Amino acid sequence: MFTLTSYFGFLLAALTITFVLFIGLNKIRLI
């Protein structure tokens, strides 16, 4: 159970970081 929760948290963090990087690249491209 703990491994599943930690895995889900890691996946959520990875998705958030990717989303932030994608938005950052789009902003740089707009400028």
Swiss-Prot record:
Gene Ontology, cellular component aspect: chloroplast thylakoid membrane; cytochrome b6f complex
InterPro entries to which the protein is assigned, alphabetical: Cyt_b6/f_cplx_su6
Annotated compartments: Plastid, Chloroplast thylakoid membrane
GO molecular function: electron transporter, transferring electrons within cytochrome b6/f complex of photosystem II activity
Chief location: plastid
Domain of life of the organism encoding this protein: Eukaryota
Transmembrane segments: 4-24
Topological relation to the membrane, as annotated: Single-pass membrane protein
Any GO BP: photosynthesis
Record keywords: Chloroplast, Electron transport, Membrane, Photosynthesis, Plastid, Thylakoid, Transmembrane, Transmembrane helix, Transport
Function field: Component of the cytochrome b6-f complex, which mediates electron transfer between photosystem II (PSII) and photosystem I (PSI), cyclic electron flow around PSI, and state transitions. PetL is important for photoautotrophic growth as well as for electron transfer efficiency and stability of the cytochrome b6-f complex.
Assigned protein family: Belongs to the PetL family.
Subunit structure of this chain's protein: The 4 large subunits of the cytochrome b6-f complex are cytochrome b6, subunit IV (17 kDa polypeptide, PetD), cytochrome f and the Rieske protein, while the 4 small subunits are PetG, PetL, PetM and PetN. The complex functions as a dimer.
Full protein name: Cytochrome b6-f complex subunit 6
Organism: Oxybasis rubra
